[in-house]
Curated annotation (Swiss-Prot):
Interacts with VP3 (Potential). Interacts with VP2; this interaction activates VP1. Interacts with NSP5; this interaction is probably necessary for the formation of functional virus factories. Interacts with NSP2; this interaction is weak. The keyword tRNA-binding does not apply. GO terms for biological process: DNA-templated transcription; viral genome replication. It is found in: Virion. This is RNA-directed RNA polymerase. Signal peptide: none annotated. It comes from Rotavirus A (strain RVA/Human/United States/P/1974/G3P1A[8]) (RV-A). Belongs to the reoviridae RNA-directed RNA polymerase family. InterPro entries: DNA/RNA_pol_sf (IPR043502), RNA-dir_pol_4-hel_dom (IPR042032), RNA-dir_pol_luteovirus (IPR001795), RNA-dir_pol_reovirus (IPR007097), Rotavirus_VP1_C (IPR022071). GO terms for molecular function: nucleotide binding; RNA binding; RNA-directed RNA polymerase activity. PROSITE patterns: RDRP_DSRNA_REO. Its EC number is 2.7.7.48. One of its GO terms (cellular component) is virion component.
Length: 1088
């Protein structure tokens, strides 16, 4: 057992270093004799520590425990109160504290003034502009850094250089924080007025960002970038990130392509040795120079110098530094503005009469036609989803806020809640539920707002619309997305696509006679000019569609959708400004509708099509691809002559002119070799991703606990690492130690061990080896997993009370009755479970469950209860398989070139040997025939877990299940009687196992699991026809081999002689695998 436990025990002696502090390790074992010794050992330790005796003799006496049992947790006593941080910090505060430039930002409150200057009193004060929104404190972060520095103060050679660099940067942070004193957080990890009033307002969030940056410093270049960003972000809280990352949009156009990967007809990436020269007009260089000058104006020195030096020969090798700067710039933290400024930002756009009406008209028509094209087929066929749109909307209703808090009665319990699902239930119970009436959002009922904060951009506002808007839009949007799924233009939704294929799409058509036009249209999406043509285009499309149907239900669905658009054309928003709530007419499109993503994509596609049709009047070219991806669109144009500087410049200016005729403030660029969009950038024929996920500051507070956030922190660290921004792993482990500790009393804390946090259980937080997901198969691992399973499902009294109320029951019955043709307990129970799960987002329920779980965990971490479970986990299956595998050394040579330069070496090596995966492995069961059959007749979407349960039932029961969901008895009978059904059994099992093994997350999503190179390392003699068993054996072998290769940079081959007698046993077991949900899996899901 590795590094974590070592770091843990050292950390504890670092933090609790007084005379009175004691650490008692707690061990456990699955061996009952040894377990008795573990219990004795613990009892004696507690006894000795009460008497104030040393524990050393006990460690000698119980050496067998320490050597053979597994560490479960460490119990830590400490009586001294926590001012330890301040005491230690003084030793590092040897430098000159930073002084904020109080004129650095346009908006007064974005300057880092002393809090009492920004907010005169506690009543006025809000922490919303600087709230780190993470369940860990500045003092913990400081402790973690000082712990690292102390541990490494004696490092030698290169390690010592890293130490010195970090020490130097920490001196800046320590001196500045020490000058004002470390702000104390309250129990919710927030910083109150009393604490902050005599300190700079942004001190905490700045210090968090700075710590995150300095703990990511390795090389001298990292040090220079970090130092500059740390110092300048203390004053500049508004534009720094934007200034530093702006040049990238031009840099990608400067590197020649010399060999690249392209997407071929089979949708695979294949290498192409083409050479494409970067053709760059002088005008572009002038723009770049201007960006660099702007950087210098705000005091940046080293970063612009690095860019300037790179520009001398624009080499791909040195481009990693550019991509590093681009990633680092995001780590200065979120830009959080006041809501009033975020809202007024869009409204400041001045209207000009001088716009090209004809262009607006063409834009509107293109939107109209696209809407019609998307929905034509389902409307003409009276699709059941469009007929039962209300039910579909209710089934997928979220538990997000509905915009206002209401008093609701559930049985005898009265609660206050803002949640949509609860409002729906309450309205239905009181006859107020009228989905046929879309409430207006005009001056009488202005829209409450949410916010979205992002580094390097201004705050954006989000509409929190009444639930009627969701119900009205849901079904139609689902149909739109279904169309987008098989339309390549929609890069974000296209089914076979992923980021790698989109990359190959662009490089495929780049050549000496083509250019690529890429535009960031985020400004346009939220501009006032877009509103009327956008909504009108949608309304006109819906009107045309209404004439294509005779079904009143479909017509009603389209009509309600149209009503949402009409209402939103006259929208008012309510913005808290100080103590008053202002009502403002808001004439722009904002996020918050169900249609946001789909409709924006449609509009952006219409926009670029219109631009291309305009420049086609002047140039002769073929449009090879048009793509839209979120806020960005791009197109590759092929001319009949080689591209020259003059052509690039002309096309560029013409495109910009066209946009300006529409008053669209967008950033349009033309290049011959690369593009830069929000999600990815292509330079020198290689693909890059921005590693900009903040670790120690979060965008907003949700209802996740410290454990969840520890898992999210780790998951963010992994994503950044795959994208080329690495934070010291030891620091991340220290943060996990801090965030997963559980306080028992003021002076007693329990720290879980590595085994607890990495075992695949409901408490899993991280992997003991980055990028490798291990499924423990030893006795102790399975034992602890069983123990945790016994306490995983926690009850909540509040939830039970709500669920047993008439209001809740009536709602679930209403849904069941509308959905089912005949009663079916599986579906009804499924709905009830889903609805009850939605109650989790109601804080009191969540807290209650969590409290129960923590207290159970506390008991468990002090003495695990052995527990005979009939549940089977994926670990049990792998444990059965493992003994039959024999390992031998093997050899695979590197045969693929690199196309993602930012990957860590070990991951890069595996990809270069076995190739990369350009598709998502289907892990939802949606490709199975039964799933398709259900969606043909019903709006109900069973989860992979439900399909897995259903498909293993008796044939009679499957038939009843299908019939109850509205599948005609004939079809249901045919299905069960055919071979398709047995194929489905296999397909669904396969999907389920892939889902359990997180094959589409982390770095596994990059590897080609069907690589012939991988297959040839596996030898499994074929015995009998049980495809499911063959599948699991092969998958296990592949994971073993890949994990070994990631860890050791070498290959093994596996031989498996699985006895035929065992196969049937294994097959039966495979139908009872329980899925485990943990903070770790939800963090993975959260990345999605």
């Amino acid at each position: 057992m590795g590094k974590y436990n070592l770091v843990l025990s050292e950390y504890l002696s670092f933090v609790y270093n007084s005379q009175s502090a004691v650490q008692i390790p707690i061990y456990y074992s699955s061996n009952s004799e040894l377990e008795k010794r573990c219990i004795e050992f613990h009892a004696k330790c507690v006894d000795s520590s009460k008497k104030g005796l040393s524990l050393k003799p006990l460690f000698e006496e119980y050496k067998d425990v320490i050597d053979n049992a597994t560490l479960l947790s460490i119990l830590s006593y400490s009586y001294d109160k926590y001012n330890a941080v301040e005491r230690k910090l003084v030793n590092y505060a040897k430098g000159k504290p930073l002084e904020a430039d109080l004129t650095a930002n346009e908006l007064d409150y974005e300057n880092n003034k002393i809090t009492s200057e920004l907010f005169q009193s506690a009543e006025e004060y809000t922490d919303s502009l600087m709230d780190p929104a993470i369940l860990t404190s500045l003092s913990s972060n400081l402790n973690a850094v000082m712990f690292w520095l102390e541990r490494h103060s004696n490092d030698v050679a290169d390690a010592n250089k890293i130490y010195k660099r970090r020490l130097d940067l920490f001196t800046i942070v320590a001196s500045t924080v020490n000058k004002y004193g470390v702000p104390r957080h309250n129990e919710k990890y927030r910083y109150e007025y009393e604490v902050m009033k005599d300190k700079p307002y942004y001190l905490v969030t700045w210090a968090n960002s700075s710590i995150e940056m300095l703990m990511s410093v390795f090389s001298h270049e990292d040090y220079l970038i970090a130092k500059e960003l740390i110092i300048l972000s203390y004053s500049n809280r508004s534009t720094l990130a934007k200034l530093v990352s702006s040049p990238m949009s031009i840099l990608v156009a400067l590197i020649d392509i010399n060999g690249t990967f392209i997407t071929n007809e089979e949708l695979e990436l294949e290498f192409s040795d083409k050479y494409v020269k970067a053709i760059v007009p002088d005008q572009i260089f002038d723009e770049l120079q201007e960006m660099i000058d702007n950087m210098r104006k705000v005091g940046l020195v080293d970063i612009p110098k690095m860019i300037q030096e790179w520009l001398v020969d624009c080499s791909l090798e040195k481009f990693t530094l550019m991509s590093k700067i681009y990633s680092w710039s995001f780590h200065v933290g979120f830009r959080k503005q006041k809501m009033i400024d975020a809202a007024l930002d869009q409204l400041k756009t001045e209207y000009t009469e001088d716009v090209d009406g004809e262009m607006y008209n063409e834009y509107t028509m293109l939107i109209r036609d696209e809407i019609v094209k998307m929905l034509e087929v389902p409307v003409k066929h009276d699709d059941h989803l469009l007929r039962d749109s209300e039910l579909a909307g209710l089934l997928s209703m979220s538990s997000a806020s509905n915009g206002e808090s209401r008093q609701l009665k559930f049985g005898r319990k009265t609660i206050f809640s803002t949640k949509k699902n609860m409002h729906v239930m309450d309205d239905i119970a009181h006859g107020r539920y009228t989905p046929g009436v879309i409430p207006p959002v005009n001056v009488d009922r202005p829209i409450p707002l949410g916010r979205r904060d992002v580094p390097g951009r201004r705050t954006r506002i989000i509409f929190i619309l009444p639930y009627e808007y969701f119900i009205a839009q849901h079904a139609v949007v689902e149909k739109m997305l279904l169309y987008a799924k098989h339309t390549r233009e929609y890069a974000e939704f296209y089914s076979q696509s992923n980021q790698l294929l989109s990359y190959g799409d662009v490089t495929r058509f780049l050549s000496s006679n083509s250019m690529v036009l890429y535009t960031d249209v985020s400004q346009w999406d939220s501009s006032q000019h877009n509103t009327q043509p956008f909504r009108k285009g949608i309304i006109m499309g819906l009107d045309m569609l209404s004439n294509m149907t005779n079904d009143p239900k479909v017509a009603q669905t389209l009509n309600l959708y149209k009503q949402t658009q009409i209402n939103l054309m006259d929208s008012y928003v309510q913005i808290p400004d100080g103590n008053v709530i202002k009502k403002i007419q808001y004439g722009a499109v904002a996020s918050g509708e169900k249609q946001t993503k789909a409709a924006n994509s449609i509009a952006n596609l219409a926009l670029i099509k219109m631009v291309l049709s305009r420049i086609a009047n002047k140039y002769s070219f073929i449009t090879k691809i048009i793509r839209v991806d979120g806020d960005d669109n791009y197109a590759v144009l092929q001319f009949n002559t080689d591209v020259t500087k003059q052509m690039v410049q002309d096309v560029s200016n013409d495109v910009r002119y066209i946009y300006s005729r529409m008053n669209a403030k967008v950033k349009a660029l033309v290049s011959t070799v690369g593009i830069e969009i929000a999600k990815r950038y292509i330079a020198g024929g290689k693909i890059f991703f921005r590693a900009g996920i903040n670790l120690l500051n979060n965008e907003k507070r949700g209802q996740s606990t410290q454990w969840d956030q520890a898992a999210i922190l780790y998951s963010n660290y992994i994503v950044n690492k795959l994208r080329g921004f690495e934070t010291d792993r030891e620091f991340i482990l220290t943060k996990i130690i801090q965030m997963t500790s559980v306080a028992i009393t003021g002076s007693l804390r329990l720290f879980p061990s590595e085994r607890v946090l990495t075992t695949n259980s409901t408490f899993k937080v991280f992997d003991s080896e980055d990028f490798i997901i291990e499924y423990g198969t030893t006795d102790d691992e399975v034992y602890i997993q069983r123990a945790f399973m016994s306490l995983s499902s926690q009850k909540s009294g509040i939830a039970d009370e709500i669920a047993s109320s008439q209001t809740f029951k009536n709602y679930v019955n209403k849904l069941s009755d509308q959905l089912l043709v005949s009663k079916n307990v599986i579906v009804s129970k499924g709905i009830a479970v889903t609805e009850k799960a939605k109650l989790n987002s109601y804080a009191p329920v969540y807290l209650e469950k969590r409290r129960a779980q923590i207290s159970a965990l506390l008991t468990m971490l002090q003495k695990p209860v052995s527990f005979k479970s009939n549940k089977i986990t994926i670990n049990d299956i792998l444990r059965d398989i493992k003994p039959f595998f024999v390992t031998s050394e093997a050899n695979l040579s590197i045969q693929y070139r690199k196309f993602m330069p930012t990957l860590p070496d070990n991951v890069q090596y595996v990809i270069q040997c076995i190739g990369s995966r350009t598709y998502q492995i289907e892990d939802s069961g949606s490709k199975s025939s039964i799933s398709k059959l259900i969606s043909k007749y019903s709006v109900y979407k069973p989860s992979i877990e439900e399909l897995y349960k259903v498909i293993s039932l008796r044939e009679q029961e499957i038939q009843l299940y299908l019939v109850s969901l509205g599948v005609p008895p004939v079809d249901a009978g045919t299905y069960v009687g055919s071979r398709i059904y047995s194929q489905d059994k296999y397909k669904i099992l396969e999907s389920y196992v892939y889902n359990l093994l997180s094959i589409n997350y982390g770095c596994y999503q990059l590897f080609d699991f069907n690589s012939p190179d991988l297959e040839k390392l596996i030898r499994i003699p074929f015995k009998g026809k049980i495809p499911a068993v063959t599948f699991i054996l092969h998958l296990y072998a592949k994971l073993e081999i890949i994990n070994y290769a990631i860890k050791n940079g070498a290959w093994i081959s596996l031989f498996c002689n699985y006895p035929k007698s065992e196969m049937i046993k294994l097959w039966k077991k495979m139908w009872n695998i329980t899925a485990l949900r943990s903070p770790y899996t939800s963090a993975n899901f959260f990345q999605d």
